[in-house]
Structures are given as C-alpha cells and as structure tokens.
Regions:
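A conserved beta-strand element that flanks and buttresses the S-adenosyl-L-methionine
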Residues: 106
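A short glycine-rich, Lys/Arg-flanked "PGG" loop and its adjoining helix->strand segment in the class I
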Residues: 119-130
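Conserved class I S-adenosyl-L-methionine
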Residues: 1-34, 49, 72, 79
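C-terminal lobe and adjacent flexible extensions of AdoMet/dcAdoMet transferase-like proteins
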Residues: 200-204
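C-terminal alpha-helical "lid/dimerization" subdomain adjacent to the S-adenosyl-L-methionine
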Residues: 12-18, 40, 135-199
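Class I SAM-dependent methyltransferase SAM/SAH-binding core
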Residues: 40-94
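Short catalytic micro-motifs in class I SAM-dependent methyltransferases
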Residues: 109-110
C-alpha cells in the first residue's frame, strides 16, 4: 500500500503537477456560482488540485487523513494569506468536525483507495447541502497496472461508469453524470499501463 505520510514531502512531481492542472480545470468547468459556495476537497494530498481552485469558491476546506499531507498544505498556505482556505486532518469515515453543510465536495484519485464505495458515497451525501454537488475524478476500470508498483494494493482497479451511477442512486443522490476526459500511460519496470480518468458528478 502507498504510505501517504512517507510520500508527502516529495509528492509534488512535475508529472503530478501537470495532471493536477488538467484535473483542476475539468472540475472548474463543472462549478456554478462558486464565488457564493463553500467547497471541500477530500483526500487533498498536498493541495495540488484544490489550491488551483482557491479563487473559485467563497470558502474552501482542504481535508486529508494523512497528517503529513496536511502539513504540506499548511506550509503552502503559510506563504500566501488566504483566510478563506482551511486545512483539516481527519478521516471522513470516522469523524468530520466542522465539515458539514458544504455546497461542493470534490475528490481526485481518492475514492479507489476506499473499500466500501457505497458507504463512502452515503457519507459524502450527508455532508452536502440540499442540491449540493459531488465531483469525483478517478480511474476508469483497468487491469491493475495503475498500482503495479504496490503489489499489496487493496483498493479498486478503477470503476465502471454504470456501477458508480447505480451506487450514487442507492446513496441518495438525485441524478448523476459521468464522462472520461483524460488518457495517459504509467510506466513501471519498463511496462506501459494505459489508463484514463473520468469525472463523475452527482447532485443531492
């Protein structure tokens, strides 16, 4: 398994930065009246995606279960004063102090690490205001090559679109839509593993 506390300090590679810019722009294209809204990014890591959206929302909460990832976020925040951004270290499946009543929740390459997807979607649903929106960027179903570097990876090898749509309905979301928008290749031990990313939007 990836140890995100150990990965935090060197997490911001050029590859991740480039991909995060594309993801942030895609998420931004789904935001309506963001300047009036409160948003939360869960699994924010070092803030690669979320901090690119800091001017989009009225208030932004950056949340991660890794203390070291949040330390990296706080270090970045200390270098430019934006009182509308707050960073929290917590596991949403255990506790979520001060995180209720948000208009948007967005996640990038996070959900496939969480075993019980339906339970997680139910939890996110409970944190949204009525008509709030969930935006999930994650991996299309693949053969496991994305995590080939981690042989004991215990999450999901991506998702089928129809599976997520059905789970979202079961979790209480009124409507949802999904589209693939990004294609790339991961290399490990000289082996190429093509993968693609989708954005999934669900409305409470």
């Amino acid at each position: 398994m990836e140890n995100f506390n150990l990965m935090a300090e060197g997490f911001d590679t050029d590859k991740r930065l480039d991909r995060a810019k594309i993801i942030a722009n895609k998420i931004k294209s789904h935001i309506v009246d963001g300047h009036k809204k409160t948003a939360m990014e869960y699994g924010c890591g070092t803030g690669l995606v979320g901090l690119q959206l800091e001017d989009v929302f009225n208030k932004l909460l950056l949340v991660d279960s890794s203390a070291e990832m949040i330390n990296q976020v706080k270090l970045k925040l200390s270098k430019h004063n934006n009182p509308n951004i707050k960073a929290y270290c917590c596991d949403l499946m255990v506790n979520a102090p001060e995180l209720h009543h948000v208009d948007y929740i967005f996640l990038s390459l996070v959900m496939h690490h969480i075993m019980n997807t339906k339970e997680f979607l139910c939890r996110l649903h409970s944190l949204l205001n009525d008509s709030g929106r969930l935006l999930v960027v994650d991996i299309d179903s693949e053969d496991g090559g994305f995590h080939a570097k981690y042989p004991d990876f215990q999450g999901h090898n991506g998702y089928e679109h129809s599976y997520l749509t059905d789970l979202a309905a079961e979790a209480g979301f009124r409507k949802s839509a999904v589209e693939t928008f990004y294609h790339d290749i991961k290399m490990f031990n000289g082996q190429e593993s093509p993968y693609s990313l989708f954005i999934f939007e669900a409305v409470k």
